[in-house]
C-alpha cells in the first residue's frame, strides 16, 4: 500500500482579514513552521507598510522567506518558488507541519499548482519601452496588446498591474510563446488543505482602515522616507507597491499626508477585492468565517478527516 503524501496547509485571505494571528495559533497547535507567501515580505527594511509579522510574532513560530533581499534586489517568482519548496522540504525533514501563509495569490497558486515558470532573463531596454508606452497611452492600451497575443494571460492579469502585464509581454517577445502556455502545471507531491479566511466586506474595510491608522502611528511615513534616503527609488518594484507608492506625492510636495493616507485606504480596499479572485481558484479550498472564535477547533475537525490527516516524513 502506497504511503499517503504529506499534507500542506495553506492559509489565505485578503489583507487585514486576520491571517497572521490565526496562523500563529495553528502553527503552535500543530508543531508547525510558517512559510511566508507574500511578494513584499521578502524585502528587508520594509516592515510597517507590508504589515510584516513583528519580531515577537516571528519568535513565537519560525518563519521562512521573510527579509530575504534588499529593496533594490530582484526576486522573481521562479526564485521564490524554488526557495519555498526548499523551505517546505526542510520543515518536513524536521517532522514539523509546513503552513503556507500569505495574500499574494500568484505566489500561492505557483506553489500549490506547481507552475513551471519560464526562466526568461529581464530585458530592461524592452521593459523601458513598454513603461514609456504605458505612461503615454495608458495601462489599458498595454493590456490590450497582451490580450491580442495571450488572451488567457490577459484574463488573469489585472490591467492596472503594469509590471505583470509588461512581464507577460516580455516573455512573449523573448520566447515567441505566450506566458500562459509556458506556465504549465505540475502539481507537487503534497496533499493540500487551503483555508480561505473571509469577513463581510464592510467589516474587512473597517479593519483595513484601522490597520492603516496603526501603520501611521507606528511611523510608516518615516519608514518610507528612510528608504528613499537610503537610495531606494520610487521606480523600484518594492517601492512602487501598496503602502509606499501612495506617499510619493507627499515627498514631491504635491499632496497632503491626509490625502495620501486616504488613497492608501482606497487602494487597499481595491487590492483586497482582487485577492479573492486568486483565492477562489486555489485547490482544496475551504472557506472559513474569520469572525468565529472557534476557528482552531474547526480546522482540527478538518484535520481529523483521513484525507487531511497530517503525515510527517523524514526523507
From Swiss-Prot:
Gene3D superfamilies per UniProt: 1.10.20.140, P-loop containing nucleotide triphosphate hydrolases
Stretches the record annotates as Interaction with substrate tRNA: 38-41
Record has Nucleotide-binding as a keyword: yes
InterPro entries: Dimethylallyltransferase, IPT, P-loop_NTPase
Residues that coordinate or bind substrate: 15-20
GO molecular function, one term: tRNA dimethylallyltransferase activity
One Pfam family recorded for the sequence: IPPT
Cofactors demanded by this protein: Mg(2+)
Summary of the function given for this chain in its UniProt record: Catalyzes the transfer of a dimethylallyl group onto the adenine at position 37 in tRNAs that read codons beginning with uridine, leading to the formation of N6-(dimethylallyl)adenosine (i(6)A).
Protein name: tRNA dimethylallyltransferase
Organism: Herpetosiphon aurantiacus (strain ATCC 23779 / DSM 785 / 114-95)
Amino acid at each position: 500500500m502506497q504511503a499517503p503524501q504529506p499534507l500542506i496547509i495553506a492559509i489565505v485571505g485578503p489583507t487585514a482579514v486576520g491571517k497572521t494571528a490565526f496562523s500563529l495559533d495553528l502553527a503552535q497547535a500543530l508543531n508547525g513552521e510558517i512559510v511566508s507567501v507574500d511578494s513584499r515580505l521578502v524585502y528587508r527594511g520594509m516592515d510597517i507598510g507590508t504589515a510584516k509579522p513583528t519580531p515577537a510574532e516571528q519568535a513565537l513560530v519560525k518563519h521562512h522567506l521573510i527579509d530575504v533581499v534588499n529593496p533594490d534586489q530582484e526576486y522573481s517568482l521562479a526564485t521564490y518558488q524554488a526557495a519555498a519548496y526548499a523551505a517546505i522540504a526542510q520543515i518536513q525533514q524536521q517532522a514539523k507541519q509546513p503552513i503556507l501563509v500569505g495574500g499574494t495569490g500568484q505566489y500561492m497558486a505557483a506553489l500549490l499548482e506547481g507552475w513551471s515558470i519560464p526562466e526568461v532573463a529581464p530585458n530592461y531596454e524592452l521593459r523601458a519601452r513598454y513603461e514609456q508606452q504605458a505612461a503615454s497611452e495608458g495601462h489599458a492600451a498595454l493590456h490590450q496588446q497582451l490580450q491580442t497575443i495571450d488572451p488567457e494571460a490577459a484574463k488573469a492579469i489585472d490591467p492596472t498591474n503594469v509590471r505583470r502585464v509588461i512581464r507577460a509581454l516580455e516573455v512573449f517577445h523573448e520566447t515567441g510563446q505566450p506566458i500562459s502556455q509556458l506556465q504549465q502545471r505540475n502539481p507537487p507531491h503534497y496533499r493540500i488543505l487551503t483555508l480561505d479566511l473571509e469577513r463581510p466586506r464592510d467589516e474587512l474595510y473597517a479593519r483595513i482602515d484601522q490597520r492603516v491608522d496603526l501603520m501611521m502611528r507606528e511611523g510608516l511615513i518615516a519608514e518610507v522616507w528612510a528608504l528613499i534616503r537610503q537610495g531606494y527609488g520610487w521606480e523600484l518594484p518594492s517601492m512602487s507597491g501598496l503602502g509606499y507608492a501612495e506617499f510619493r506625492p507627499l515627498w514631491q510636495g504635491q499632496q497632503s499626508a491626509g490625502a495620501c493616507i486616504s488613497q492608501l485606504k482606497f487602494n487597499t480596499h481595491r487590492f483586497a477585492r482582487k485577492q479573492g479572485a486568486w483565492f477562489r481558484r486555489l485547490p482544496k479550498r475551504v472557506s472559513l468565517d474569520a469572525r468565529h472564535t472557534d476557528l482552531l477547533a474547526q480546522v482540527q475537525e478538518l484535520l481529523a478527516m483521513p484525507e487531511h490527516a497530517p503525515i510527517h516524513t523524514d526523507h
